[in-house]
Amino acid sequence: FFIDTATSDINTLSHHDALPISRDGNMQKVLVVVDMQNDFIDGALGTKEAVAIVPGVKEKIENFDGVVLFTRDTHETYYLDTQEGQKLPVPHCIRDTEGWQIRSELDALRKTEPIDKETFGSTDLAGELVAMNEDNEIKSITFVGLCTDICVISNALLAKASLPEVPIIVDAKCCAGVTPESHENALKAMEVCQIQIDR
């Protein structure tokens, strides 16, 4: 993979073909960047807390010594007819809209295709992590992104259930919730479930 600086186009690998940037012994580290999309940052469901974590997430990706995966919340035009749409009647992350796009400064760092997901937790992501671990043992999986209390907690718990012997880490400084209170509640819930919270 490479970034063409002349056109800013990214030539991407599939997730499973992604090679770790470097390894600790024979073990690889994984960073999962959850739903860092415009609608969750300063769009339809944006918050000032989400805006505030963007520089830290960018730095985390740039300095991460391992494989970086991205998830992308993806809804269709009939979103309001879905169960989620009925409970949260705010159209967001509709496929091919500006709000659906990963934040540009983060997307420029992406080296694999995003894992699109229609709901909070991604079984595709969990399956990808299991497959990666079978190919080359994973030392740790770190989660950052949005929202702490919805999609971060859902995917961190799926990873914990799928790979119970792999340390799961959430970088609290690089996450934001729907509210500061729900962010803290989610961190506490994950900690009870033996997920490491880095503050």
Ranges and model annotations:
Residues 57-61, 153-163:
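Histidine-anchored nucleotide/phosphate-binding helix
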Residues 6-19:
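Short, small-residue-biased leader/transition segments that mark boundaries at the very start
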